[in-house]
Amino acid sequence: MQPALAPAPHPSMQTSAQDHADQVLHDSLLAAQHLSQHPQQPRPQQPNAQPHHLQPTATTSPRDQNNIDPAISGGAMLPPSQPPAQPEPTVEDETPKTYGKRPLSTSKRAAQNRAAQRAFRQRKESYIRKLEEQVKEYEVMSQEYKALQAENYQLREYVINLQSRLLDSQGEVPELPGNIDLNQPRTEISVPQPAPRPGQAGASAPPQGSPQSQVSIANDDMNSLNRIAEAGLGMRKHPNEEAFLSNNFQARRGRGDETADPSETKTEPPTHGLPMVS
């Protein structure tokens, strides 16, 4: 007994099925081309179930499906190949990187700020202590300078006293400073001459030159002493200088009187009448 043959499909039904398969193939090619051009963009996964247009319609009979060309129907009926799942990017810190370095978190930044402030305070305190020590050193130096200045004044007074005593004890005159000129004329002191005795006027006439010479010598001595006093650079006068000068003048005057007395006082010849033996 031979099996019954299936009736041949209608030509219009074959044409519609072929058009539908061509459309499905064209869509799959477009999708593959789109994936090749944009591989990085993730494509939403398609459900395993076939799309509505791939499922056989209720009106299509099993015989129509069997009559479709296997080369076309095989690729059309199979679901399109799924693209490989791309690995999900690892989740990094929420803060973006700037200039190749990751910015610090708020806590780390606050800790660094506190450390910087602490170091600044320490430097400021050390600098203040250093300045205080320098101020103390300057105060000590000022006190020492004042003490040295007072000692210098005392030593200057002492040197002036020594110079005045040297001038009194020795006749050496120190070197004349450049700002003092001793060539200026000075008024000479007039010394009163003693009045001659009435009984000895004739006898005292010849030796009158000796007291005048002594007076001129005294004047010269006083002038030289005045010059020495001018050369003392403002040195204080010795308290006994005037007394010394007056005593010296009186002594010289007394010596002049003594030299004049022997010539003035002559012994009268005796009245006994005998000749005198010289």
From Swiss-Prot:
bZIP domain spans which residues? Answer: 103-166
- Pfam families with a match to the protein in the record: bZIP_1
Q: Where is this region: Disordered?
A: 1-121, 173-278
Among the GO molecular function terms of this UniProt record, one is: DNA-binding transcription activator activity, RNA polymerase II-specific
- Residue ranges, annotated region (Basic motif): 104-127
Q: What is its main location?
A: nucleus
Q: Where is the composition biased (Low complexity)?
A: 109-119, 198-214
Spell out the residue ranges making up region: Leucine-zipper.
Answer: 131-162
Q: Where is the composition biased (Polar residues)?
A: 56-68, 215-226
Listed InterPro entries? AP-1-like, bZIP, bZIP_sf
The entry's keywords: DNA-binding, Nucleus, Transcription, Transcription regulation
One GO cellular component term: RNA polymerase II transcription regulator complex
Give the PROSITE patterns listed for this entry. Answer: BZIP_BASIC
Question: Where in the cell does this protein reside?
Answer: Nucleus
Q: Where is the composition biased (Basic and acidic residues)?
A: 254-269
Q: Where is the composition biased (Pro residues)?
A: 1-10
The family line of this record is: Belongs to the bZIP family.
Task: Give the protein's biological function.
Answer: Putative transcription factor.
**What protein am I looking at?**
Putative transcription factor kapC
Q: Which organism is it from?
A: Emericella nidulans (strain FGSC A4 / ATCC 38163 / CBS 112.46 / NRRL 194 / M139)
Gene encoding this chain? kapC
